[in-house]
Amino acid sequence: MAAVTELPKMNQELAGAVREGLELKKVETTEKNVLPTKEDVAEEKQHVERIHEIEHFDSTKLHSTPVKEKIVLPSADDIKQEKQHLELTDKINNFPSENLKKTETIEKNVLPSPTDVAREKTLQMAASFDKSALHHVETIVSTDVRVTEAQ
């Protein structure tokens, strides 16, 4: 063990205050961990009892009840709509076709003429022309100009 002289020294003022004992101020203590109220305890107890009752419920105590089906009659609006629908379908099915006039159909989407088709084909052929099939040709320019007089 270390000798007393080797231990760290304490401040003289602090050592004197420790020996004399300082007078401490009176302080009011406050609880940081508040205990639950009677209402909280009763509510938790009730909750635990309900859970226990649900877990240990005897389903044999239940009585079966007969199912009563109610027949709902349609409203006046529903009947009116259905009646209108039936009248319309009846009128369509029993429509007198003798009163209709015969008409000739006129073709409004006329097919293009052969010249228009040929013109369109030449444009397509020019756009997709393959130049690799062409052969190289030297051009010969002639400078001989012959003038003939008209008689």
UniProtKB/Swiss-Prot annotation:
Keyword GTP-binding appears in the UniProt entry: no
Record-level Gene Ontology MF annotations: actin monomer binding
Top-rank lineage group of the source organism: Eukaryota
Renumbered residue ranges of the record's region 4 X 6 AA repeat of L-[KH]-[KSH]-[VT]-[EP]-[TV]: 24-139
Cell location: Cytoplasm, Cell cortex; Cytoplasm; Cell junction; Cytoplasm, Cytoskeleton
GO biological process assignments: actin filament organization
Name the UniProt record assigns to this protein: Thymosin beta
Organism (species): Caenorhabditis elegans
Name of encoding gene: tth-1
